[in-house]
């Protein structure tokens, strides 16, 4: 089985394990002091958490593309049931695509989006949207 691997620095591996267990609905496949990894089946993902205090949350953002708006809505509901704060965006233009998405932040601040692409779009973002795939993203705004 092939899967994407993401290795993330986290400030507190215990706190991160609680969050990612809720986010993906699975427990860690391996747990060691300062280390954990998850073998997520859907979406196929190997997530590695490495405790590195002070370096957590340093990525721009991470994402999971799903097939439909219904899957975005289901994820939003599941995350709300787990008391994880979400920010939903429907019909936004980002990275030359019209998307529905929901955002969450892990305990170290790394932003995650669960999104579906509805259609191609002529630009990166509609005027008034948060910085998306622009120089503004480098200033800390999440980008798709």
Question: Where do the language-model regions lie?
Answer:
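Short acidic/glycine-enriched loop/turn segments that link adjacent beta-strands
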Residues: 32-35, 56, 95-100
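Vicinal oxygen chelate
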Residues: 63-111, 119-122
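Residue-level structural signal for beta-strand termini and adjacent loop
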Residues: 51-52, 117
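N-terminal beta-strand motif that seeds the catalytic metal site of vicinal oxygen chelate
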Residues: 1-14, 44, 61-62, 124-144
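A conserved beta-turn-beta hairpin within the catalytic core of GNAT-like acetyltransferases
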Residues: 55-58, 123
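Core segments of cupin and vicinal oxygen chelate
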Residues: 2-46
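Conserved beta-strand in the GNAT
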Residues: 46-50, 113
């Amino acid at each position: 089985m092939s899967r994407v691997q993401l290795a993330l620095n986290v400030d507190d591996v215990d706190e991160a394990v609680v969050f990612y267990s809720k986010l993906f609905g699975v427990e860690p496949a391996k747990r060691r002091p300062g280390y954990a990894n998850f073998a997520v089946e859907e979406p196929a993902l190997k997530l590695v958490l490495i405790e590195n205090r002070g370096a957590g949350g340093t990525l721009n953002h991470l994402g999971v593309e799903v097939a439909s708006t219904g899957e975005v809505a289901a994820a939003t509901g599941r995350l709300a049931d787990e008391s994880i704060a979400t920010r939903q965006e429907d019909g936004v233009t980002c990275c030359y695509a019209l998307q529905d998405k929901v955002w969450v932040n892990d305990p170290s601040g790394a932003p995650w989006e669960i999104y579906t692409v509805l259609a191609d779009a002529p630009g990166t973002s509609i005027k008034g949207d948060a910085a998306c795939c622009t120089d503004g993203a480098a200033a800390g705004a999440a980008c798709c």
